[in-house]
Amino acid sequence: QERGQEFRDGVQVATLDPFAGYKKALDDELDDTVAVLDAFHVVKLGTTAVDEVRRRVQQDTLGHRGRRGDALYGIRNILRAGQERLTDRQKARLDAAFTQREEHVEVDVAWQAAQQLRDAYRHADLATGRKIAEHVLESLPTCPIPEIARLGRTLRQWRAAFLSYWDTDRSSNGGTEAV
């Protein structure tokens, strides 16, 4: 309101975190503006879901939080990285942890889901990235892993703002948040 109507009329795209308060403020004050979920925050939601699965499976299988020497605890930092950045040694560590126990398959599937989400954002072609994102929206909410299904429901709830990323030439608030 301080900047005036002319400024508000000039705002065409607004990137935001997946927080309902931001969306409500945007709808109230800039109702013709296209809302776009910021890629960093969406990928962070995916990474957080993977970590929640890892911690739950760790607790369920061993009865305690992660400790040095526990397979899933040992890969916790690797799980935060993008698949394209992993060394051969890190890939081998992931594979060893995922195959150590049958229950670890949940962590593997969760990690693959998060990587698919990252791939949508990283794809060089916007149309292909959007197709990957649409597939994510269709598949994650029905995932039998509760944390991943919750992520899928969250993304489905934000569907328009999530998919707007590919319609607005990769709009991001990274520059603003870096200040």
Predicted regions and their residues:
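Acidic/histidine-rich catalytic cores and adjacent linkers
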Residues: 2-32, 40-44, 63-179
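Short secondary-structure boundary/capping segments
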Residues: 28-34, 50-55
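Short loop/edge segments at beta-strand edges and connector loops
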Residues: 37
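Short alpha-helix plus adjacent loop in nuclease-associated cores
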Residues: 42-63
